[in-house]
């Protein structure tokens, strides 16, 4: 007896043949068609236990067919496949009630697994298709495999309120992912409130998040609502969560556990209804090991982990991204621009330490500062060239410029190796190079007093002594 009846609709004969062979070997009865009309006739007659359909067919788009299928047979699982591979082709099937979205080409083993899972699930699954209005803008751009995986995860999350933890380097677009999750999810009609934990003074974080009552502290002349209250019914995006102080982490954990909070200076618990999406450019597991982040809070936030890849891992998306940013610049009144083939190759060879944000800034700069319609490789070379180091300039690099100085050094360091990739062990080599002058400077400033140097550095005295020994740092004591 067949494991189930599968209806397959795709206008590509080769795709139909491959799916027929794979599904038949897995024990399913398969019916094939190359058009939407036949698929709709089968569905309306009550045939099939599951549907696999392409988006684009000769007579009708699957996006238009899906709502009719779900209205007639709400418990019929529908798997949508597409070669278009954009954010919207991933999100629209989910919005219209599809069980799963698969970008072409896909792994047949994965398809068989998804089919088995869909048929095994309880049939009381009820879809909640969105309205049929067109979306005004596409928040995420890219067709690379890395982005396809993000789209698929987002599509699965749209009709849930699960807490999401987004990780990724600075400039990768973590807030854009959070906004997409809100704007196309079930809370889209509620507010989206973003809080950058790194930008709030330490002593004001709890007031910022939970609000305060009049007289709660000096200067609190009126009651103020917090971000939880402002995000009620919507999404609260906690950016740079790794910078949250431990005491605020404790209060946040309590809110996640109990679903309520109290304002600073308040006594009455307030129920909260928000979806939490957190993000960090730091490895929270390392912060946990260092005693800087609560492990129990991490597990509460990390219900669905989502990593946004750096631009260098999705460099094939660069042409789409640069066109997108040029288009945005044109909408802001800047002249239209294009890149020639050599200029595009130059961009693909760049390491992009600032990720997508760096590319966006470059696109706007090109649109604003260069008169030619077509940007050439020479312009790109000039824009991406590291700044010239003048005599004595290294002596003037201050703390505010340390990140930029390290970035410039690393860019030069990487370019000195074949294919721009240095040998393994870079992390520890770079840390050692930075650690030695840092410890030496602290010891010099404290005249060799290791207790004062440890306090200055924020290290345990025994830790400092071990580092001095391991790094073979000479300690010179002086009087005074």
Curated annotation (Swiss-Prot):
Q: Where is the Sigma-54 factor interaction domain?
A: 140-368
Which SMART domains does the entry mention?
Answer: AAA, REC
Pfam families cross-referenced by the UniProt entry? HTH_8 (PF02954), Response_reg (PF00072), Sigma54_activat (PF00158)
Residues reported to bind ATP: 168-175, 231-240
The protein's GO terms of the molecular function aspect are: ATP binding; ATP hydrolysis activity; phosphorelay response regulator activity; sequence-specific DNA binding
Q: What PTM annotation applies here? A: Phosphorylated and dephosphorylated by NtrB.
Keyword Cell membrane attributed: no
Write down any Gene Ontology CC term. cytoplasm
Q: Which SUPFAM superfamilies match?
A: CheY-like, Homeodomain-like, P-loop containing nucleoside triphosphate hydrolases
Q: Which InterPro entries match?
A: AAA+_ATPase (IPR003593), CheY-like_superfamily (IPR011006), Homeodomain-like_sf (IPR009057), HTH_Fis (IPR002197), P-loop_NTPase (IPR027417), Sig_transdc_resp-reg_receiver (IPR001789), Sigma_54_int (IPR002078), Sigma_54_int_dom_ATP-bd_1 (IPR025662)
Q: Which GO terms describe its biological process?
A: nitrogen fixation; regulation of DNA-templated transcription; regulation of nitrogen utilization
Q: What CDD domains does its record include? A: AAA (cd00009), REC_RcNtrC-like (cd19928)
Q: Name the keywords, alphabetized.
A: Activator, ATP-binding, Cytoplasm, DNA-binding, Nitrogen fixation, Nucleotide-binding, Phosphoprotein, Repressor, Transcription, Transcription regulation, Two-component regulatory system
What protein name does the entry list? DNA-binding transcriptional regulator NtrC
| Source organism per UniProt | Bradyrhizobium sp. (strain RP501 Parasponia)
Q: Which gene encodes it?
A: ntrC
């Amino acid at each position: 007896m067949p494991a189930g009846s599968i209806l397959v609709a795709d206008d590509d004969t080769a795709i139909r043949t491959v799916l027929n062979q794979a599904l038949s070997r897995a024990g399913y009865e398969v019916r094939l068609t190359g058009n939407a009309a036949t698929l709709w006739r089968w569905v309306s007659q009550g045939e099939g236990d599951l549907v696999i359909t392409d988006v684009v067919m000769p007579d009708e788009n699957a996006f238009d067919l899906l709502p009719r299928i779900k209205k007639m047979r709400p418990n019929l699982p529908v798997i949508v496949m597409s070669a278009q591979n954009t954010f919207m082709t991933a999100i629209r099937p989910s919005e219209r009630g599809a069980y799963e979205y698969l970008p072409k080409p896909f792994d047949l083993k994965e398809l068989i697994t998804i089919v088995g899972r869909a048929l095994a699930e309880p049939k009381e699954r009820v879809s909640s298709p969105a309205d049929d209005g067109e979306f005004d803008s596409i928040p995420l751009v890219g067709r690379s495999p890395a982005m396809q995986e993000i789209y698929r995860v987002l599509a699965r999350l749209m009709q849930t309120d699960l807490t999401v933890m987004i990780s990724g380097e600075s400039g990768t677009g973590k807030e854009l992912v959070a906004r997409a999750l809100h704007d196309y999810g079930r809370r889209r009609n509620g507010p989206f409130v973003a809080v950058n934990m790194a930008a709030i003074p330490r002593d004001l974080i709890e007031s910022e998040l939970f609000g305060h009552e009049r007289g709660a502290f000096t200067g609190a002349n009126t009651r103020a609502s917090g971000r939880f209250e402002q995000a009620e019914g919507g999404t609260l995006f906690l950016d740079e969560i790794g910078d949250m102080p431990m005491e605020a982490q404790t209060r946040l954990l309590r809110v996640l556990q109990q679903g309520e909070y109290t304002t600073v200076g308040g006594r009455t618990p307030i129920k909260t209804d928000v979806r939490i999406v957190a993000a960090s450019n730091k490895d929270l597991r390392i912060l946990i090991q260092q005693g800087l982040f609560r492990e129990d809070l991490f597990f509460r936030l990390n219900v669905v982990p989502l990593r946004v890849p750096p631009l260098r891992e999705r460099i094939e998306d660069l042409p789409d991204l640069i066109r997108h940013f040029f288009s945005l610049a044109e909408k802001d009144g800047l002249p239209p621009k294009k890149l020639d083939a050599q200029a595009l190759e130059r961009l693909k060879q760049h390491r992009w330490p600032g990720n997508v944000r760096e590319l966006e800034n470059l696109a706007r700069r090109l649109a604003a500062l260069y008169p030619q319609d077509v940007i050439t490789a020479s312009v790109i070379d000039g824009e991406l060239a590291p700044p010239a180091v003048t005599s004595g300039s290294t002596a003037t690099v201050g703390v505010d410029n340390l990140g930029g100085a390290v970035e410039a050094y690393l860019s030069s360091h990487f370019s000195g190796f074949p294919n721009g990739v240095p040998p393994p062990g870079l992390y520890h080599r770079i840390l050692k190079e930075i650690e030695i002058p840092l410890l030496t400077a602290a010891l010099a400033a404290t005249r060799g007093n290791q207790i004062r140097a440890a306090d200055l550095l924020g290290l345990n005295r025994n830790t400092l002594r071990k580092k001095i020994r391991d790094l073979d740092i000479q300690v010179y004591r002086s009087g005074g």
